[in-house]
């Protein structure tokens, strides 16, 4: 029933389309790192929740620990939020990779920019998580100009960071975010 409601909101209220070869594979992939870009506005979070619900798959996301205060913490945990301390160097990549190894099913959604501001290069944490956990990366674009999301086929990192990042960044190059001037361009 929830899937029907999410899809109704996406299709009829905000007129958003979901395209790609692999939205069925999101559920068949028990483990993956899902990167969503461009992340330019706080509204992206709610659009992501709608897309995730419309596709009927579960995923978690990281949020700074400072946000997990009552009563907001209830909502964040309910929507899949995992609190992280970003202020200290606590080997976060290995900690997250160990979550994949301990669970039969775990999907983590991340914004590869690491901020809502414009960046010229993506941060690399998601990449190293995927390599260490031995899971594919699925790319999901939020194109506000065309009101659509495109989902990539699963991409298995080769370990050649330059090659892999060229491939990943090309997928998102020129996709217009909610705040156009913060969109990702190579």
Task: Outline where the language-model segments fall.
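Charged phosphate-binding loop/patch that engages nucleotide di/tri-phosphates or the phosphate backbone
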Residues: 170-186
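Soluble catalytic domains of membrane acyltransferases
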Residues: 16-174
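N-terminal membrane-anchoring alpha-helices
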Residues: 1-19, 183
């Amino acid at each position: 029933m929830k899937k029907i409601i999410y899809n109704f909101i996406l299709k009829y209220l905000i007129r958003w389309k979901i395209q790609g070869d692999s939205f069925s594979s999101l559920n068949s992939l028990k483990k993956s790192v899902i990167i969503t870009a461009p992340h330019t506005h706080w509204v992206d979070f709610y659009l992501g929740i709608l897309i995730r619900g419309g596709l009927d798959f579960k995923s978690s996301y990281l949020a700074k620990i400072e946000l997990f205060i009552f009563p907001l913490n209830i909502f964040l945990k309910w929507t899949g939020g995992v609190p992280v301390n970003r202020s200290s160097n606590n080997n976060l990549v290995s900690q997250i990779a160990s979550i994949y190894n301990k669970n039969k099913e775990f999907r983590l959604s991340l914004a590869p920019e690491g901020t809502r501001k414009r960046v010229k290069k993506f941060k690399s944490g998601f990449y190293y998580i995927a390599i260490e956990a031995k899971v594919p990366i699925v790319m999901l674009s939020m194109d506000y100009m065309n009101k659509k999301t495109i989902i990539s086929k699963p991409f298995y990192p080769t370990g050649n960071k330059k090659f892999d990042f060229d491939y990943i960044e090309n997928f998102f190059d020129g996709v217009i975010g909610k705040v156009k001037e913060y969109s990702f361009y190579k």
